[in-house]
């Protein structure tokens, strides 16, 4: 999981969600695309 100041979708399968007040990107195709803001 990457921790970044700004999270962006890296492919069309990426989804931006909010968990516990944090913005996260989860991807069903590529696990490398997982990101968390903070």
Curated annotation (Swiss-Prot):
One Pfam family assigned to this protein is Ribosomal_L36
Keyword Lipid biosynthesis among UniProt keywords: no
| SUPFAM superfamilies to which the protein is assigned, alphabetical | Ribosomal protein L36 (SSF57840)
Which PROSITE patterns does this one have? RIBOSOMAL_L36
Molecular function as annotated in GO: structural constituent of ribosome
Cite the entry's keywords alphabetically: Ribonucleoprotein, Ribosomal protein
According to its record, what are the GO cellular component terms?
A: cytoplasm; ribonucleoprotein complex; ribosome
Going by the entry's taxonomy, the superkingdom of the source organism is recorded as: Bacteria
Q: InterPro entries from the entry?
A: Ribosomal_bL36, Ribosomal_bL36_sp
Q: Which GO terms describe its biological process?
A: translation
The answer to whether the entry has keyword Ribosomal protein is: yes
Q: What family is this protein classified in?
A: Belongs to the bacterial ribosomal protein bL36 family.
HAMAP family recorded: Ribosomal_bL36
- The protein's name is Large ribosomal subunit protein bL36
Q: What is the lineage of its organism?
A: Bacteria, Bacillati, Cyanobacteriota, Cyanophyceae, Synechococcales
